[in-house]
Design a protein with these regions (language model features):
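A short acidic Gly-Thr/Ser loop motif
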Residues: 23-29, 90-92, 179, 424-432, ...
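Nucleotide/phosphate-binding catalytic cleft detector across ATP-hydrolyzing
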Residues: 1-2, 7-22, 37-44, 50-421, ...
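Glycine-rich phosphate-binding loop of actin/hexokinase-like ATP-binding domains
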Residues: 32, 41-56, 420-465
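Short N-terminal binding/cap micro-motifs at the start of the first secondary-structure element
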Residues: 29-32, 96-97
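A short helix-loop
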Residues: 467-490
Length: 622
C-alpha cells in the first residue's frame, strides 16, 4: 500500500489530498504515523516511523525527536516535510521524572569495628585466629602468640613463602595477601595454612589487632564468619559487639573465604537517616512508613481514594526523594514547586546492595529496600509549547489532540480479530495506561506510574550492575551460557550447537542473545540468578500494575467484566511479558494478547494511529 499510495500522492498533487501526521511522544520513544485524506473523505495510512525521545517527555527538547521521526516517515513515501498539512500530538498526560525511581532503605553509617572480604581464589582450608603481623616485622614476632601474617604486593609469592618457611618457630596460623597469589604461595609452604588474597586496601589493615580468617573447601561456602555467633566465638565478642557485626556476617553469606578484623570498639558511631513515611493527600489523608513494605504501601494508596498529591517525611530518604522529583520536574516544566504534584506511585519490594563502611574491599550486603516510580503532574500542560514550537519550525499547523489512553484504544481497534467492548493496556517506558472502550463509545481511562524503566532499575539494583545499559539489555534479551567453543546452554536448559566456533572471549561467560550477536555480561553473576531477578522484576512491575490498572477501568471495578485485552506499547514487544500477563489474566477468563496495529505494526504505533483515526471522526480541524 505504501508504494502505491506514494505514487498516487505525486500524481494528484497536494490539492486533493491532505497529509496528516499523528505523533505519540513517549517516555522512551517517539512514534509517528502518516495518513492521507482525500476530498471524498477516503482515508489511507501511508507510513510510520519511530525515534528515541529527546529530553524528558512533555518538554521542549522533544521537538528534535519529533522532527527526526516525521522526516523519516515522510522520506518513506518520497515526500518533503513541508507537504504535511496537519500534525496531531498526543495529550502527554502527566510526565514521569527521570529521577523518580530509586530504592529507599535505611542508611546506617557506622565506623565499623569489623572488616569482611571475599576473594575468588583463596588457598588452604579451615579457620584461623591470631594477631595481625606485617611480613616486614616478622622478626619481631614472639613464639607464644598466634599470628596472621599480612603481606603487601611489594613482596613476591616466592619471598612470602620463603619467609614463612624460615620462621617456622613462630605460630603463624593464616596469611592475608594483597596480590592474587594465594595458590602460588600455598604450593611452596612446608605447613598448610588458610590464605586469603586480593585484599586491595592492605595498608588499612591495623597491625597487632585480633583477626579471624576462614577459607572453605572448593564448592562449599564459609560457615563460621557468615554467622554472627561464629564471629563472636572466634573473636570473643560480647552481645552488643555481636549485634554490631551482624551486617558483616550477612555480607559474607555464600562466600568462599573471608577476613574479619577486630578494630578498637570505642569508635562505633551510628548516624541513621530513616527510610521515612509517605503522606497520601487524597479523599482521605493517610500515611505509612516505608518499612512496612510495598504491599502495604500500595494498599494504603488504594484506601486514600483519588490522589491529589503525595509527599514524604522531611529529612528522611523518601522525603528527600519526593522533594528532588518535584524540584527537577519544576525545572523541566518551568513551574513553581507547589504547582508540581505526584498523583500516583508504584512501590516494589527489592534488595539493594548497601556498602558496609569500614570494608577492606568495598564489600556490600543486600538490604531490603523499596523501589518507587512516581507519576508527576504539572499545573499547565507543556504539550501546548511543543505544538507551538513545531508550528514555527515546520510552518505546518500542529494541535494537541486527545488523551493518550483513548488514542491508544482507537489504534488498538485496528488489530485484526478485535471488537467492542475492548480494553487496552499501553505499557511503555514510564507508565502503564489502561482504557476500556464501550460499544456505545464511552471510554474509561487510567494512567499509572511504573513500567519498563522501573524494571530496568530493579534489575540494575538487585544485580548490583554498574551500567544501566547492561540492565536494559538483560531486560530485553534471553540468556545463555557459553559452555564450550561450539555450544551454549540456553536459559530454558536446552543446548544450542554451532558449526563455527564461538569467540573464545565469551567462553565460560553468561551472554545475552541479541538479534545477530551475543552480548557478554562482564559481571560474574550466575545465569540462574540473573534469570530469577529479571522475571521477578517484570512480574512485580507489569503483572501487578496491569491488574491494578485494569481493575481501575473495569465496569464495576470487576476484572471479570472485561472480555478481551489488547496489549500495546513498547513493553508489549517484550519476549516474556505478554505471556506472563496472559497467565495472570487467564484466571479472570480474559482473552489477552499482543496487539497488531493496522495488521502490520505489531504492538507499536497505537497512539499515533489513534490520533489519525480520531481526526476522521472530527475532521473540522485544520
Amino acid at each position: 500500500a505504501c508504494t502505491g499510495s506514494s505514487r498516487n500522492i505525486r500524481k494528484e498533487g497536494n490539492s486533493s489530498l491532505k497529509l496528516i501526521a499523528g505523533v505519540d511522544i513517549g517516555n522512551s520513544t517517539t512514534e509517528v504515523c502518516i495518513g492521507s485524506v482525500g476530498e471524498d473523505g477516503r482515508f489511507q495510512f501511508l507510513s510510520s516511523a519511530s525515534r528515541i525521545t529527546t529530553g524528558t517527555k512533555g518538554t521542549l527538547p522533544n521537538v528534535h525527536g519529533v522532527k527526526a521521526a516525521l522526516e523519516e516517515a515522510m522520506h518513506r513515501i518520497g515526500m518533503p516535510l513541508e507537504k504535511l498539512d496537519l500534525v496531531r500530538l498526543n495529550e502527554a498526560a502527566p510526565v514521569i521524572g527521570d529521577t523518580a525511581m530509586e530504592t529507599i532503605t535505611e542508611t546506617i553509617i557506622t565506623e565499623s569495628s569489623m572488616i569482611g572480604h571475599n576473594p575468588a581464589t583463596p588457598a588452604g582450608a579451615g579457620e584461623a585466629v591470631g594477631r595481625l603481623l606485617f611480613i616486614q616485622n616478622i622478626d619481631k614476632g614472639r613464639s607464644n602468640i598466634p599470628y596472621i601474617l599480612v603481606a603487601s604486593s611489594e613482596y613476591s609469592y616466592e619471598e612470602v613463602a620463603r619467609k614463612l618457611n624460615q620462621y617456622e618457630q613462630l605460630d603463624i596460623r593464616g596469611l592475608i595477601l594483597q596480590a592474587d597469589e594465594a595458590v602460588l604461595v600455598e604450593n611452596r609452604l612446608n605447613k598448610k595454612i588458610p590464605i586469603v588474597d586480593e585484599v586491595r586496601h592492605i595498608d588499612k589493615v591495623p597491625e597487632y589487632k585480633m583477626a579471624a580468617i576462614e577459607v572453605a573447601l572448593p564448592g562449599t561456602s564459609i560457615r563460621m564468619l557468615s554467622n554472627p555467633y561464629g564471629i563472636a566465638t572466634l573473636l570473643k565478642l560480647d552481645a552488643d559487639e555481636t549485634r554490631a557485626v551482624t551486617p558483616i556476617a550477612k555480607s559474607l553469606i555464600g562466600k568462599r573465604s573471608a577476613v574479619v578484623i577486630r578494630t578498637p570498639n570505642g569508635n562505633i558511631k551510628e548516624n541513621i537517616l530513616p527510610a521515612g513515611e509517605i503522606f497520601f493527600h487524597g479523599e482521605q489523608e493517610l500515611r505509612i512508613n516505608i518499612d512496612h513494605g510495598a504491599d502495604e504501601i500500595m494498599d494504603t494508596l488504594q484506601d486514600a481514594g483519588e490522589i491529589f498529591d503525595i509527599d514524604g517525611q522531611p529529612d528522611s530518604n523518601v522525603g528527600n526523594m519526593f522533594s528532588r522529583i518535584k524540584t527537577s520536574m519544576a525545572d523541566v516544566a518551568e513551574a513553581e514547586n507547589h504547582a508540581v504534584r505526584i498523583t500516583d506511585i508504584l512501590a516494589v519490594d527489592t534488595l539493594a546492595p548497601v556498602e558496609i563502611s569500614g570494608a577492606l574491599a568495598g564489600e556490600t550486603c543486600m538490604e531490603k529496600a523499596v523501589g518507587i516510580a512516581a507519576m508527576v503532574k504539572t499545573a499547565h500542560l507543556p504539550m501546548q509549547k511543543i505544538a507551538e514550537q513545531l508550528e514555527k519550525d515546520l510552518h505546518t499547523k500542529a494541535v494537541v489532540a486527545g488523551v493518550e489512553a483513548v488514542m491508544a484504544s482507537l489504534g488498538a481497534m485496528t488489530t485484526p480479530g478485535t471488537r467492542l467492548p475492548l480494553a487496552i493496556l499501553d505499557m511503555g517506558g514510564g507508565s502503564t495506561d489502561a482504557a476500556v472502550l464501550e460499544a456505545d463509545g464511552r471510554v474509561r481511562t487510567t494512567h499509572q506510574a511504573g513500567a519498563g524503566e522501573l524494571v530496568t532499575m530493579l534489575i540494575q539494583t538487585e544485580l548490583g550492575l554498574k551500567s544501566r545499559t547492561t540492565a536494559e539489555q538483560i531486560k530485553k534479551y534471553p540468556l545463555g551460557k557459553v559452555e564450550s567453543l561450539f555450544h551454549l546452554r540456553l536459559e530454558n536448559g536446552a543446548m544450542q550447537f554451532f558449526t563455527e566456533s564461538i569467540d573464545p572471549r565469551y567462553y565460560g561467560h553468561v551472554v545475552l542473545l541479541a538479534p545477530g550477536e551475543m552480548l557478554k555480561i562482564e559481571e560474574d553473576i550466575p545465569m540462574e540468578r540473573i534469570l530469577e531477578v529479571r522475571r521477578e522484576a517484570k512480574r512485580k512491575v507489569f503483572v501487578r500494575n496491569a491488574v491494578r490498572a485494569l481493575r481501575q477501568v473495569a465496569p464495576g471495578h470487576e476484572l471479570r467484566n472485561i472480555p478481551n485485552v489488547v496489549l500495546v506499547g513498547g513493553s508489549a514487544e517484550d519476549f516474556e511479558i505478554p505471556e506472563m500477563l496472559m497467565q495472570a489474566l487467564a484466571e479472570y477468563r480474559i482473552v489477552c494478547g499482543r496487539g497488531n496495529i493496522r495488521g502490520t505494526e505489531g504492538p507499536r504505533n497505537a497512539v499515533a494511529t489513534g490520533l489519525l483515526l480520531s481526526y476522521i471522526g472530527n475532521s473540522q480541524e485544520g
